[in-house]
UniProtKB/Swiss-Prot annotation:
Listed name of the protein: tRNA (guanine-N(7)-)-methyltransferase
Family to which the UniProt record says this protein belongs: Belongs to the class I-like SAM-binding methyltransferase superfamily. TrmB family.
Naturally occurring in which organism (per UniProt): Staphylococcus aureus (strain Mu3 / ATCC 700698)
Function: Catalyzes the formation of N(7)-methylguanine at position 46 (m7G46) in tRNA.
Keywords: Methyltransferase, S-adenosyl-L-methionine, Transferase, tRNA processing
Coiled coil (residue ranges): none
Catalytic activity entry: guanosine(46) in tRNA + S-adenosyl-L-methionine = N(7)-methylguanosine(46) in tRNA + S-adenosyl-L-homocysteine
Metal-binding is among the record's keywords: no
Protein's pathway: tRNA modification; N(7)-methylguanine-tRNA biosynthesis
Binding residue positions for S-adenosyl-L-methionine: 43, 68, 95, 117
Record gene name: trmB
């Protein structure tokens, strides 16, 4: 996805430190950042925030973190949080490789990866969010009952992710090869999911856990 640069976005985000972490000021203190101590769920690569804000509105008993590195997109998530008055959703503007700088071991209950960049060239495999170095980070911060939810329209990335997770020692509790035909009605659409689905694209989804989180 090509992101149009917004020169004012960084200053706008910095004006809301109670909602947005720009420079790691809450690193290691995620639980304390929220008003209530509740399970923490993360979406990595939140885009414009439709998925994560909908989840937060539906589940006030869960604390959510939107992690998105593109400042020129994050402001849209911030606008939604403010408009909806969500107190259980915070935003980290940083790269996923920094996850263990923000979260303590076992602090997270669920991680969402929705329509991540597939990085189709083999030489870019290390950038895929289901590459083994990222899986190691997820394993570190997830608690013993924690799980990973993954959605994509990219068949190649889905196949790669199944193999990568299996080789890493994960197991699958749910796999959908055509989500919108199989879904039970609980699926929450992302902005891109609706766009892809309207074009007739098949949506793939899985839920996975680590055999041993630690």
């Amino acid at each position: 996805m090509r992101v149009r640069y917004k020169p004012w976005a960084e200053d706008y985000l910095k004006d809301h430190p109670e909602l947005v972490d720009m420079e790691g000021q809450h690193a290691g203190e995620m639980t304390e950042w929220f008003d209530k101590t509740q399970p923490i769920h993360i979406e990595i690569g939140s885009g414009m925030g439709q998925f994560i804000t909908t989840l937060a509105a539906q589940n006030p008993h869960i604390n959510y973190i939107s992690m998105e590195r593109e400042k020129s997109i994050v402001y849209k998530v911030l606008d939604k949080v403010k408009e909806m008055g969500l107190t259980n959703l915070k935003i980290i503007c940083n790269d996923a490789i920094e996850l263990n700088e923000y979260f303590k071991d076992g602090e997270v209950s669920r991680i969402y990866l929705n329509f991540s960049d597939p990085w189709p060239k083999n030489r870019h495999a290390k950038r895929r969010l289901t590459y083994h170095t990222f899986l190691a980070l997820y394993q570190q911060i997830l608690n013993d009952e924690g799980d990973l939810h993954f959605k994509t329209d990219n068949r190649g990335l889905f196949a790669y992710s199944l193999e990568s997770m299996s080789q890493f020692g994960m197991y699958f509790t749910k796999i959908n090869l055509n989500l919108h035909q199989e879904d039970d009605g609980s699926n929450i659409l992302t902005e891109y999911e609706k766009k892809f689905s309207d074009k007739g694209s098949r949506i793939y989804r899985m839920e996975a856990k680590f055999h041993s989180q630690k």
